[in-house]
């Protein structure tokens, strides 16, 4: 298989939606979990980690491919590790929280277990989201139902807690893929100290995690699911380019007029 290279335009676009989404999501989770260390697998430039840092989490590590330009990192260089996410990672340490947000769909299906193994090897608590079928995006080669990932975590003793989606599903500042796909997975050790409201959000054993989304989201998925993958990638690349340029112009505007 030809290796897909993610361009600066891709990461410019990702940064835009990631930062706007990270602030309310982390604003909700941080006081609930109070992590002192966070790992992000598929971190890109580290925008999510920078938002964790702004909440006071000093110990962060982002892991992504060597295609990430380290001159553009949002975190310190020593807080980033270039690695192959299709292989199981052994970082030799544990974190209070590991996360992987909208990454699994970019990896081959055969690497799904490796990703989950890497996350569960690193923490008792994992914040996870990945694109569902029909979501669409650049190089989405592994869109899966949420229950697919649920089964992989269950095989490692991690239970799903659906605490994030009910809180954020109406917050349009958060990109829909984070609003509708984010699940907290926790093993037996990680349950200790969880607040009562998160404990009440545990998905009953034997119950699949339900797909999220409003009518517009479901219609979008229905349409996109019938398009060829290459067409979806091309559409996503054009859209990312337009939105990235728009964001750059908006941020440059005040500076030019000053």
Regions found by a protein language model. Give the residues of each.
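Conserved beta-strand signature within the Rossmann-like core of class I S-adenosyl-L-methionine
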Residues: 123-133
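A short His-aromatic
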Residues: 106-107
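Hydrophobic adenine-recognition pocket in adenosine-nucleotide-binding enzymes
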Residues: 103
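Conserved N-terminal segment of class I S-adenosyl-L-methionine
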Residues: 1-99, 110-122, 136, 142-148, ...
